[in-house]
Amino acid sequence: MRRIRVRSFRAEALSALAVVVSAIPLGAQEPPDTVLVGDSLATSFLGVIDSSRVADTLIVEDSVSADTIFYNLPRPKNSEPASFATGVWEWDRADIMADGANNLAELFHALPGVIALLGGDYGTPSSVTAFGLGGGGYRILRDGLEVYATEGSVPNLQLIGLAGISRVRLDRSMGQMMIEMWSHEYEDGRPFSIIEAGTGDLDTNLFRGTYVDPVALGGSVAVGLERMDTRGRGGEGTEAGNRTGSWARYQVHVGDRFGVALDYRGFSTQTKVPEYTPVTKRSDFSARAAYQPVEGLTLSAFAGRSTYGIDAAADSLLILDGSRSQLGGSLAVERGMFWLRSSYRSFEGLLPSGRIEARSGFSHHRWGGLSGSWSSSKWNDIEVSSVGARAWLKPTTFTTMFASYEDGSYGSRVGVLSGGIPSLDQHGLATEATASIADRTGGRAGVVIGLGGAALGGAALYGSADRVLPLGLELDDGAIEGTGLERNGYEGMVVLPIFLQGLNLEGSYQFWDEEAPYQPRQIYRGSFQFHRVFLDSGNLELWASLGVRGHDPMLTFVKDNEIGEGSLARVPFYQSWYMQAQVRIVTVRLWFGMDNMTLRRNLQMYPDRLLPYGRSFFALRWDLWN
């Protein structure tokens, strides 16, 4: 049996941190004072300084300061606002660090109705679901390029890193969720660094670092590195694993209106869990150009290539790999309240071979808005399409009424990426990747009432599908699709300020009249949340939370099932109590968290794939201008 060496690198991380800090000249850092420094939350909310502000600076000072020279590739920014009413959530860099998430599954699992599908600890496959969405249940766009699945029907979230990511957006649509990610955007003309290092139970260690220089090598340069390792739940490291990623980007800018970016991201995972591939890796290389001929109009073109590789078995020397490319372009229009997004993508292979889509809408901060979407793609020359619409209206300042509707067909691939190696069935025979098409319809309508910092919302839910598809990852690879079903349900949320300033009671609840694969009848979230900024300078900030995440017993897809019917098995109810705390002093963040505080020993999303019985974790997160 091949052994995978998973090293504890607590000393390495701390040493690297010490070297980085000591290598920075003290005079090159911005000394803290009574004024909030440039990389504080206030600056991140203000966003990038626009060209007019730079021009004003040049006129007033009659000289050019290096700190005022920086450019970003133009990109559209208007869309549906993030809220429970629209079903959209967003995180900026400060939000991600405050959450303490180490991957997308951890970032999303606190949201109403969202379940993280985990195969174990770090290094094992992971995914997410909402509304019972399985195969083809979500897509990922990163800097405008699609991060398509290299194996199965959805991307393995363990292979999607957060190094260098400054913003994440989740659109929790009932037909297909959309995850969008954006890499670092410059806010200042000085070099900038982010250092994150942590350690915890089960020999868990984290290091994530990012360095960006907006004026280097005739353009701008950014690099990132991250690693997470653990010995896992098993004794003597029998379930040890790690995930390691890197990122590099070079951009050439012609002012604020045109730029070209070359981007590379590589990621690999290792695990000793015998049910999973011991080594999995993917890399994504892309070239992207963006042009803004006039204010409010953005054109972009992009090309990318992804490669994927696995060790077929722990006791085998066989290495399997494949690759796939994509080409495409997009057009975006923003005029006052109106916005439009459209794109076309051509993929190597037939699963899918191409996709064209458009989204448009109106949005007003006082009165609300409406939006619509359309998408069409080809799977083995079969055209599938879907449409969606949503509205959120504010008849009063404290009331928001909302509704959304999605209907269409959605493609899902079974097997590895097109153009790569074929899948191996249970008899060791090669099988070509195939496509499954599912018809889905979903609707949601409700109201949110907010007054004086308190909010109460609820919505009626409807969902139907002609079939339910497995993810196609190692989590349920080989499972047979389930029969369709029609369900009704409702969900609610509450935010209630209580006796202490900055302290809220927050919660969400979702109920369905019938369970389904990846959709338990009840899902609940509840927590006490504290967030407050102290001192007039704003240089002291505190977050704290104590809560619970849980759901009823759940049906999951499995390949070899002995306890359920067909390809379905039932796992016990899930309940995990947790706490988190973070204090920010100027730009240094000290973070502490505990998961599964009650030490429940049968937490699982798949039969016999037990999750860690408890973990406390401490991390230092520091961003600084160099």
Regions flagged by a language model, labelled:
Residues 65-89, 105-146, 182:
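Extracytoplasmic beta-strand/coil segments of soluble accessory domains associated
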Residues 29-99, 185-190:
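N-terminal periplasmic "start-of-domain" segments of outer-membrane beta-barrel proteins
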Residues 197-201, 227-231, 264-270, 303-309, ...:
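Transmembrane beta-strands of outer-membrane beta-barrel pores
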Residues 145-172:
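Short acidic/polar hinge/loop motifs at secondary-structure boundaries
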Residues 237, 255-328, 349-355, 373-381, ...:
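Flexible loop and strand-edge segments within Gram-negative outer membrane beta-barrel domains
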Residues 612-626:
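Outer-membrane beta-barrel "beta-signal"
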Residues 175-180, 186-246, 256-258:
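Outer-membrane beta-barrel translocator/receptor signature
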Residues 186-191, 215-219, 254-259, 292-298, ...:
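Short loop/turn motifs that connect adjacent beta-strands in outer-membrane beta-barrel proteins
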